[in-house]
Amino acid sequence: MKTLWICVSAGLAAMTAVIAPALADADADLIKNAESAAPPAVGGGATIYAPQADGSMKTLREGSNGFWCMPNDPATPGDDPMCGDGNSMEWAMAWMSKKDPPKGKVGLIYMLAGGSDASNTDPYATAPSENNNWVTTGRHVMIMNAM
């Protein structure tokens, strides 16, 4: 039994030694992609979040400048990383929850790598279709909730 435990422990340690660097490389690639959405002074100090399949957000890196960035969404046809300020995150969370955005708060989102934006007619579209006017845009910034 002791020999089995030693073998299992050694196997788990070996797997960790192989998997951990691969995960770190994947996170580094996501961080680099996310940072590409904004000027270096913004992206370099931003908190980096990666959306997970269950709808939660994984923090890849804590930031220091009040901005956040997210890497490309693989569910969209193009590369679309983005970075924004705190007010834009409140707007985005309201949009994802299908709720009204916060009143009286203007946010800024950078998409300097361009974007593959959802529909111009359906803000909850998840794929291009014949009737939803899916658009691909170049480098841009978005002012959120400026009403």
Locate the predicted segments by residue.
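Bacterial N-terminal signal peptides
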Residues: 9-17
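Primary mode marks residue(s) on the alpha4-beta5-alpha5 output face of response regulator receiver
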Residues: 25-147
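Sec/Tat signal peptide C-region and signal peptidase I cleavage site
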Residues: 18-24
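Bacterial N-terminal signal peptides that target proteins for export
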Residues: 1-9
